[in-house]
């Protein structure tokens, strides 16, 4: 039977090139053929849809294989991969993918001359919304055709009958890739025929010449196929932005829902900034009327307050092409190109992170061109964009990834406007994941536990579930601060950790309007959310066999909450009327290694020929440490790539062990390691100070150039200490006297590496000490080599960081006050005054070519930054200690770097292995007692394996920077 199946499948695949008159998907399940001048689409031999287009010409010739392979910064899936077969049918270009079709008509005099229409027979179950220029409405289920004007997307269920069917095939109709000179379209129905009609309020294309239509898109398959499809972005133009490193999805506190005029009140804005700071939300949205702020305050004051709290502000604008008279402002600041450039440049200088632009007026060509102008200008000034009162997504989120969300939805704002939303919200919420949200990000503004002008009757767990079910790169949390801060600690932590960009999305169960259960993965953590769209109790099906067992937390319906930690993943979950749940499954921290047995995991990475500096792109934001990484299995290779970049451009190559002969012995309590290369020998000596408590083998803390942490932290702990004497490898004191390279012990072994920076050589030296500990073993050294820590302060803090980053046998790295060139991001230091920056550091430590190539504004060509140096430590533990009293240390830049680096640990569900503590009021390298608890927590957990109740992952004595 299996062989017959394989034979049939092979025949279907062959038919893609051999069967005349029929277009076939790569997997053979989807076909398109011409009958009576109409294109008939079938899925697994079942007719799904008919459409007419262009001249109805026959499908001829061999197809061309089309591949879409790209990465999204936000969306339902990070890495998108799709293949299709492209056919030419006269003026029609037809693509048949495994999950749908896309077609466009070329050589049109204007878009009004397109002749595309779909046939939707009576009896077909359909979820379809009447068109409005803001795309705010419900998707009621119907089976009868009705003349009118309808909005995208349209969801259909076949076979053509009015009953639900387990074998049903679904089709979702929409469009993609609106470019300049085009308008968006909608559907006009006359009986069973739904014509594609561009917005009739404009010329809709060139009056003369030849134009092509946008892609007409039909996603086809099971409900899961429809929900999980990326076809809308697959056919869109690729990203046009050279530098996307500054684009950061995230959660947002939002003033408007509870206070419609709150953005003209500085004190109310402060409440929402404080909420964002408390919950660690990266953004706050200051909405309409900020240009009318009273009390002697201005938007500059509000932005400054947000930045001082470490919160990035977004601000609102009226597009001034839709609702103008009587509408809120600011108005008329973006319409003209020169005004737009001036306004967005002002936003960038002030520290605004993005803009929400509202009140457009439909899908006309002028509006589409205006939207593209706004996106391109915003990108030039590093501004995120949220379109409101505007069209629905049509692929721009791939082409212009600074467009992180779009309204185009009947969302929670309508609790302010109409009483009917209260009774219809639950069913509507259970419809949106199958309709509107399929095609792109949706700014519904979810998670309202309290009431606005009109009450909500959904449960708290239902509201929490919407934050996962509704995909949006900027997820605006609409409720008032006191509502969120009165929730259980578990709920507040959930909101603090909530991702807004997903690696993977799966539909688990559901049916439009009745219920939906969806699972989204971020790194190694799964977020499973479900809601009941009905007014009756309902048990939702949760078959989660694809999720590995892990630490689970379930937020379910209660009064108002039931929060539990299930030992096994539930197969069903009972929900109250209009109820819901969220299940968070984190891979057990023990499932990811705390430390490795080897210096560098061998993943087969081979360094390429690195580009010349002049050929490197300019990146103002911090590069993406997780570029090309979908899950933890890919992280080792990415670590190798980052490490190779840092060595090539920054510190020089750390020699591999291949050509070295290493031997070790104990001389009393002193470890002696001899390293011989080509007849030259370098000797390392370090005395092991054993603890007075506990039994061997002991964990060990290695101090770079000494132990800077207070002695009392180790007195009562079974931890040995030893010192890496860096002068045995590269004598910094001699460099400070003579400023000569190539005159150090290391250079006798490796004379061809005399241009290396000292941090490469010191990292090599500490690794050889660890070699000695491993070679002799715990029976001789009394040291447990699975629990090695490294620490240092100031220049030795940098040394500790490089040593920990470049040797994966180090379980815990504590870098104390490392300053510029350590954890601080070079790019951020460049924007600060009187700090240790790339051109103002000690070049004994780095390659001289780094200063020559990347000083000044050339720092923006650096292909990495030091948040990635920090990230090399992941999945092992890292603690950064700062002191803001010493400006030279550039702790503002370190804080920016730390926050960006922690995203790597967070992606893999182990964010508690990385933290920072920046506290003043003490001397340089003199750890105050107020920081003992953080340091002790890390030592106890990662060197001693103890459970700790206290953990502060992100404490800083100032918040005066913008990431």
Write out the residue ranges for each language-model feature.
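Cap/lid segment of the alpha/beta-hydrolase catalytic domain
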Residues: 321, 703-779, 785, 819-828
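C-terminal beta-strand-rich structural cap/linker in extracellular carbohydrate-active enzymes
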Residues: 565-597
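Carbohydrate-binding surface patches
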Residues: 511-547, 581-584, 679
């Amino acid at each position: 039977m299996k062989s017959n199946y394989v034979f049939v499948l092979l025949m279907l695949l062959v038919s893609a090139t051999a069967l005349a008159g029929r277009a076939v998907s790569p997997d053979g399940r989807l076909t398109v053929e011409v009958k009576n001048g109409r294109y008939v689409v079938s899925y697994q031999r079942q007719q799904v849809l008919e459409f007419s287009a262009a001249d109805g010409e026959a499908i001829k010739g061999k197809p061309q294989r089309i591949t879409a392979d790209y990465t999204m910064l936000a969306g339902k899936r990070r890495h998108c991969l799709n293949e299709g077969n492209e056919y030419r049918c006269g003026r029609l270009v037809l693509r048949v993918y495994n999950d749908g079709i896309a077609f466009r008509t070329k050589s049109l005099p204007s878009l009004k001359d397109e002749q595309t229409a779909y046939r939707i027979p009576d009896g077909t179950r359909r979820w379809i919304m009447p068109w409005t220029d803001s795309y705010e409405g419900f998707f009621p289920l119907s089976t009868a055709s009705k003349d009118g004007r309808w909005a995208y997307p349209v969801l259909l269920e076949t076979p053509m009958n009015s009953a639900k069917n387990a074998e049903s095939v679904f089709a979702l109709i929409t469009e993609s890739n609106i470019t300049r000179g085009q308008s968006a379209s909608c559907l006009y129905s006359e009986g069973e025929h739904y014509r594609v009609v561009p917005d009739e309020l404009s010329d809709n294309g060139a009056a003369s010449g030849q134009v092509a239509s946008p892609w007409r898109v039909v996603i086809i398959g099971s409900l899961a196929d429809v929900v999980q499809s990326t076809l809308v972005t697959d056919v869109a133009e690729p990203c046009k932005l050279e530098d996307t490193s500054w684009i950061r999805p995230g959660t947002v506190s939002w003033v408007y829902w509870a206070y419609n005029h709150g953005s003209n009140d500085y004190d109310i804005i402060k409440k929402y900034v404080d909420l964002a700071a408390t919950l660690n939300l990266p953004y706050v949205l200051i909405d309409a009327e900020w240009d009318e702020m009273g009390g002697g305050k201005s938007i500059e004051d509000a932005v400054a307050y947000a930045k001082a709290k470490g919160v990035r502000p977004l601000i609102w604008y009226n597009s001034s092409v839709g609702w103008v008279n009587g509408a809120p402002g600011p108005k008329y600041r973006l319409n003209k190109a020169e005004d737009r450039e001036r306004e967005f440049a002002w936003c960038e200088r002030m520290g605004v992170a993005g803009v929400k632009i509202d009140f457009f007026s439909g899908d006309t060509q002028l509006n589409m061109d205006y939207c593209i102008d706004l996106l391109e200008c915003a990108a030039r000034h590093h501004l995120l964009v949220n379109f409101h009162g505007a069209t629905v997504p049509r692929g721009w989120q791939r082409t212009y990834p600074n467009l992180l969300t779009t309204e185009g939805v009947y969302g929670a704002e309508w609790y302010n406007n109409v009483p009917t939303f209260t009774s219809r919200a639950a069913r509507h919420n259970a419809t949106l994941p199958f309709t509107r949200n399929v095609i792109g990000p949706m700014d519904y503004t979810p998670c309202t536990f309290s009431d606005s002008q009109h009450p909500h009757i959904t449960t708290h767990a239902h509201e929490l579930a919407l934050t996962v079910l509704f995909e949006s790169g900027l997820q605006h949390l609409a409720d008032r601060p006191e509502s969120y801060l009165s929730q259980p600690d578990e709920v507040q932590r959930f909101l603090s950790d909530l991702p807004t960009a997903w690696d993977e999305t799966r539909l688990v169960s559901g049916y439009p309007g009745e219920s939906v259960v969806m699972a989204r993965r971020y790194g190694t953590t799964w977020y499973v959310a479900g809601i009941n769209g009905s007014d009756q109790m309902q048990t939702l099906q949760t078959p989660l066999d694809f999720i590995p067992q892990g630490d689970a937390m379930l937020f379910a319906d209660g009064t108002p909450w039931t929060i539990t930690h299930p030992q096994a993943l539930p197969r069903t979950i009972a929900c109250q009327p209009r109820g819901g749940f969220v299940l968070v499954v984190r891979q057990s921290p023990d499932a990811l290694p705390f430390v490795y047995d080897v210096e560098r995991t061998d993943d087969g990475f081979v360094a390429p020929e690195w580009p010349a500096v002049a050929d490197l792109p300019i990146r103002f934001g911090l590069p993406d440490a997780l570029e090309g990484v979908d899950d933890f299995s890919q992280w080792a290779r990415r670590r190798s790539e980052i490490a190779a970049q840092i060595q090539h451009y920054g510190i020089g190559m750390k020699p591999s062990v291949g050509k070295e002969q290493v031997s070790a012995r104990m001389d009393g309590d002193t470890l002696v390691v001899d390293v011989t290369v080509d007849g030259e020998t370098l000797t390392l000596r370090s005395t092991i100070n054993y603890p007075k408590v506990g039994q061997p083998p002991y964990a060990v803390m290695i101090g770079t150039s000494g132990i800077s942490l207070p002695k009392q932290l180790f007195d009562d702990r079974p931890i040995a200490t030893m010192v890496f004497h860096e002068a045995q490898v590269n004598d910094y004191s001699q460099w400070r006297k003579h400023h000569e390279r190539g005159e150090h012990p290391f250079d006798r072994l490796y004379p061809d590496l005399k241009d290396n920076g000292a941090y490469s050589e010191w990292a090599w030296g500490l690794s050889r000490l660890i070699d000695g500990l491993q070679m002799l073993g715990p029976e001789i050294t009394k040291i447990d080599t699975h629990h090695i820590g490294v620490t240092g302060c100031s220049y030795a803090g940098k040394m500790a960081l490089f040593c920990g980053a470049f040797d994966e046998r180090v379980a815990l790295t504590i870098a104390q006050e490392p300053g510029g060139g350590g954890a601080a991001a070079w790019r951020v230091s460049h924007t600060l005054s009187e700090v240790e920056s790339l051109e103002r550091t000690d070049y004994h430590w780095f390659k001289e070519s780094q200063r020559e190539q990347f000083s000044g504004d050339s720092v923006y060509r650096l292909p990495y930054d030091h948040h990635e140096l920090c990230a090399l430590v992941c999945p092992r533990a890292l603690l950064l200690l700062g002191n803001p009293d010493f400006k030279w240390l550039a702790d503002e830049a370190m804080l920016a770097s730390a926050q960006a680096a922690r995203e790597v640990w967070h992606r893999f569900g182990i964010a508690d292995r990385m933290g920072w503590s920046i506290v003043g009021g003490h001397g340089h390298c003199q750890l105050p007692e107020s920081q003992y608890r953080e340091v002790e927590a890390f030592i106890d957990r990662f060197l001693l394996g103890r459970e700790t109740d206290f953990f502060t992952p992100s404490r800083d004595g100032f918040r005066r920077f913008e990431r």
